[in-house]
């Protein structure tokens, strides 16, 4: 019935396979949940729908195991011509989930695999969007939006670098139309050099600061 309705309106069907709900016979075949089993399950479902005369499909394989998920996509991609929706499922809270998603999606996307993505986090879905955009931008797959780079604190830091960097990062979220890099540096010793690849940068010192543009101190 679902396939018939999808045919009627030409609506894509997402064929989803999750490591947490893999078919019992496939788990028994491989002895446990494996990348090979995830791929087999997905291809079985694809064939079933194709046999019903429908091929407007999107395929999604997800696992909370980062390396298993990456391996599954490496195995699936050569065997599948349909768009792939990529994500690390049940990745966790903001801290752990972002790390797992960045590593997993980075491995997969950097191989040219994947058409759409989702960062799955336990929390506000708005954070998922921001994280997904940053992952794509870091991999060179998305343009636009101001990138903020900042140095770690060290013994030369005499300003509230953490607070300043966070404040700048919040300010730039409104400017998706600008594709520039902003550097926030904590000292005037290494700041100018570290900010030279940024379009604009600031380097703060004790009672002083520098404004840097394209590697040149302008103020």
Give the role of each language-model region.
Residues 1, 94-97, 211-214:
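Short, charged, surface-exposed secondary-structure boundary motifs
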Residues 18-21, 26-173:
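Catalytic alpha/beta core domains of metabolic enzymes, predominantly
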Residues 125, 154-158, 188-194, 198, ...:
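Conserved structured catalytic cores and adjacent interaction surfaces
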Residues 164-196:
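Hydrophobic alpha-helical bundle architecture
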